[in-house]
Amino acid sequence: MKLKSMLLTLFVLLSLSCSGRSATNDSSSAETAVLQSSKPNKAAAAYLETGGERKLELLYKKTPEGDLHLDLYYPTPKPLGKYPVIIYTHGGGWAAGSKLGAGKALFAVVFKKLVNQGFAVASVDYRLWKTEGTVAMRDCVIDSKDAIRYLSKNSESLGIDPLRVYAMGDSAGGQIAQMLLLSSPESLPGDPALAGTPYKMVAGVSWYGPCDFEQEDLFNSYDRAGFRDRFGPRIVKPGSKPEEKLPLYREMSPINYLTKDSPPLLMIQGDKDTTIPVKHAYYMQKKAAALKAPVEIMIIQHAGHNWRKVDADIEPSREVIVARTVRFFVDHLRGH
């Protein structure tokens, strides 16, 4: 009898032990599932928060280096009909950064204001230059143009107006934004599936972006002796012939696409910027004056790259820069 009692007790304990292990495993599985399902939520914190509809991670192009995506933020509230769209191209020296820059710092402030003014915003990833890679600056531009072509091709399902496309970028993205604005839609073709898709650029804003690579002295902020070109390797692919350098420099210089019929451009530059010197804004302004092209410049005093203050507070303030940027887009929304 005592033996039966001991065996029964042992059986109960073993059963409870197995049940505990099963419960632990189930709990672990459930926790893993929760963690997996929470990953998108963690990632979502990096996206621009507008309070309105968003279409995130839209695949617009496949490349040998990987798939390319864009994030589309809709106006709040949505106006009737199709929406004008601002293409945002991030900075990072054509070698770093991502479309998530739209949700950071001043860019988040700008784009929240713009979606409230009736614009959609498309923040674009493009291929990045690497020291040992084959991607060059022109690929960054081609990818960004293909993003517009994708939006145009899918304008009906996405609700985007391909005849009201705007551009904005900072630093390297400022150069890309100028290229999007000033070069023709047919130029720099990329994905054959998107080739020939029509669209129309209306206006654009460049924050501290370069306008000309051929004039290398524009990058020499203090006219230093022995100044060396820093961006050549990002324009000319390894293995290129020496005679290919100048045509590629000219091809990637937005100023060469400027005409009297170009869409309006606003360039905002800091007078203490040693990365992309203020010379670029003045040089573009001079060319625009000769052509009677619609280019405006705004010079920020005591401002380095990324509106970093140098020696004193920047003037006008970042708030004024934001307001001027938003007003420029809104002014060119009317009548289009």
Stretch-by-stretch model annotation:
Residues 261, 267-269, 273:
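Short beta-strand/loop motif that positions the catalytic acidic residue
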Residues 33-81:
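N-terminal cap/lid segment of alpha/beta-hydrolase-fold proteins
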Residues 149-220:
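Primarily recognizes the serine-hydrolase "nucleophile elbow" in alpha/beta-hydrolase
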Residues 102-106, 110-111, 116-117, 122-162, ...:
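Catalytic nucleophile-loop/oxyanion-hole region of alpha/beta-hydrolase
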Residues 314-336:
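Catalytic active-site module of serine/aspartate enzymes centered on a nucleophile-bearing elbow/loop
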Residues 47, 63, 215-257, 263:
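Mobile cap/lid helix-loop segments that gate and shape the active-site cleft of serine hydrolases
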Residues 81-93:
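Short beta-strand element of the alpha/beta-hydrolase
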Residues 274-283:
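Conserved alpha/beta-hydrolase "acid-adjacent" motif
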